[in-house]
Amino acid sequence: MTSSHPPSPPIEPMLAKIADILPDEPGFQFEPKWDGFRALVFRHDTSLLLQSRDLKPLNRYFPELDRALLEQLPPGCIVDGEIVIATPRGLDFDALQQRLHPAESRVRRLSTQTPASFVAFDLLAADGESTMALPQAERRVFLEALLRDATPPLHLTPVTFDRAEASRWLKEFEGAGLDGVVAKLESALYEPGRRAMLKIKHARSADCVVAGLRWYKDLTDAVGSLLLGLYDDAGTLRHVGVTSSFTMAMRRDLARELAPLREQALEAHPWRATIDADTQAGPGSQSRWSRGKDLSWVPLRPERVCEVRYDHLQGSRFRHATTFLRWRSDKPPRDCRYDQLEVTTPYELARVFGA
């Protein structure tokens, strides 16, 4: 253990950069990538702070964790991990987002109906001393000792040093709602705010209908993102997400290229009903976690198809923004259906911790 005193909050969590494949060099350890809210837990003498990735307190949104972690974690420790909500269908990120609500009564009700868990994967301090200058391998040993008697909702993330097993995790654990695999150098120190780890996520492609756009910032001659749709079994075009990975030159080219599709686009647009009804189903609808963001959009006649790269679905939509790959002028929009997407085999979440 190091002799320096533990740092005070806030602390930026160490981050990960995307890698295409699992590293095959020696000296890496692999962990599941949890799909939740990143959080640091600061256990003081008689209190506890749950700090978000953007350095804000989360205690009021997760009162059940505030109590449980205060009981189970010893004073003087700082633990890095992920807040998740587990359901019979796997991890539920939407349920997490519903916690970010100003009404305390609603938060407390949800804390009973859909209780959260905390999955620990790193240790920044123990026994009142910093561990950030220790190698990852040593921090893991101390973390395992700290959580030897942990009980739900506190969990220790699994770890493997076998690349083949990590590859199996990458494939199988998605069925429980996990987001990929994280690779950490065993010799690495904890570096707040630095992308010192690797994250390997699922990579797939899909052909989608382009049915709208959003402008780039306050410009009306540059596209910020394209709104994507897929047809369901009933023949209804559903909004599934956005793609926004464009250079500035591409943004201006797209504005010119798509201008003809803006003409008379709203008259028979498949998403017009959601606009008129002001429901939460339309691509411009507000949610409690997007208040203040400009979600206005410009409808396009749904006549163009593009291929995008995505990682996985959350419900009926892409979990993250997709990456634009190319136009598919050879494909009719009506052929862009949900049934083209890869179906993930369900995987019991409890088996992840038994891995």
Model-derived features: positions:
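Catalytic cores of nucleic-acid ligases and guanylyltransferases
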Residues: 1-355
